């Protein structure tokens, strides 16, 4: 489902509608990939009623609440140039009040070497991060047009750099959201139905530089999201009319 930045900002002002459903759908899957225990119903309760249901760690509660705020910030930032200061702000919003806020410099590149559990992948050293991210962002911002493959390539390179001490997966998927909005590409929410395929395709791309499988997973996730949001087709058509008037 294609929704550009302007339309998404318009939709954000319509209560009890597609914006909230999309927000829940995107965040549920993205957070679940990182071990969040919130169900969709519990996430919706937190969003709409500011109530926490279920048994969750304090950090999970705080970071889930923060992710709702980051989503809105990403929408607000769509259309603006992607740079490290924007990423710093997203990371600070995501991690404020968590354990990481107490022991790490949130909203900054990592200070200590980090690693991924269960995979043989060497991540960038802290001293390398600023230069690598400068090159990644510069090359992306110089593109005259952005394709799904460009988004996949950016994603695997970002995750291989792993520029923050923690929270890289979530920030990386927020970047995907921003990119899709800005280039009128069908939105991507990494559905947990394709969790293993996503992880395997991401790892393959990071090891070989071949993002073909990752593009395939993105397409599956696009189709899955389309199916879930089909009920809003008429609303989106009406919004198009309203925005032209």
Language-model region placement:
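FIC/Doc superfamily catalytic core
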Residues: 1-245
